[in-house]
Design a protein with these regions (language model features):
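Catalytic alpha/beta core domains of metabolic enzymes, predominantly
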Residues: 106-181
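Conserved, mostly hydrophobic/aromatic
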Residues: 8, 25, 33, 82, ...
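Short, well-ordered coil/turn segments that N-cap beta-strands
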Residues: 2-3, 29-31, 63-69, 86-88, ...
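Glycine-rich, proline-tolerant flexible connector loops at the mouths of alpha/beta enzymes
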Residues: 34-53
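Charged helix-capping and loop-helix junction motifs
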Residues: 48-56, 161-168
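Catalytic cores of alpha/beta
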Residues: 15-20, 76-85, 126-134
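Catalytic beta/alpha-barrel core
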Residues: 48-50, 67-79, 88-102, 115-127, ...
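Active-site mouth loops of central-metabolism enzymes
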Residues: 3-20, 43-49, 67-73, 93-94, ...
Length: 181
């Protein structure tokens, strides 16, 4: 069985950028487009995403190209409007995964919704925090879960922006055997 490929821009910046990217991805066999609509930033006055105005762009791609669409959600409002615009799946970002209150809010807002929810590892290498996010979602009845390993931030300069620390996703897979990673 072919692995599910999800691809797209980190940030949706314009309708044209998103549609051009989606067209190229579809022509290369990608079935799911991902695009960040809201971008949590460390410091103020940085690009924080286009917000809700980008959701119709994704919806248009879904209708015109037949691709599945997904975006990151960080709170109940994001979930509500993402679902309103027909997201086929959502993901919880690394910063949100690190906040149990945010994960709980998202989990509660997804109760009764039957779409996949992917969870990025937290920014810091804490497997219990990552597992806790899955537990919160599962306890709210969300069963279509998957993990995204993006690596972990480091204070020091390193070869990679995010250090893989492979032992953590390997341990996650050992502890939650049927979890897609």
């Amino acid at each position: 069985e072919r692995p599910l490929m999800i691809a797209g821009p980190c940030s949706a910046e314009s309708e044209e950028q998103l549609f051009n990217t989606a067209t190229k991805l579809k022509n290369n066999g990608i079935e799911v487009l991902r695009a960040g609509i809201w971008k949590p930033r460390t410091r103020p006055n940085c690009f924080e995403g286009v917000g809700v105005k980008g959701l119709p762009w994704l919806q248009n791609i879904q209708k015109e190209l037949g691709m599945k669409i997904s975006t990151e959600v960080a709170n109940a409002h994001h979930v509500e409007v993402a679902l309103k615009y027909g997201m086929n799946m959502v993901w919880i970002g690394a910063r949100s995964t690190a906040n149990p209150f945010a994960v709980q809010e998202i989990a509660e807002s997804l109760k009764g919704v039957d779409i996949p929810v992917l969870v990025k590892n937290p920014v810091n290498p804490d497997i219990e925090l990552w597992i806790g996010a899955f537990e919160r979602l599962y306890l709210c009845g969300i069963t279509k879960l998957g993990a995204i390993h993006r690596g972990f931030s480091s204070y020091n300069s390193t070869r990679y922006r995010n250090m893989p620390q492979w032992q953590i996703p390997i341990e996650l897979k050992r502890r939650i055997k049927n979890l897609p990673l």
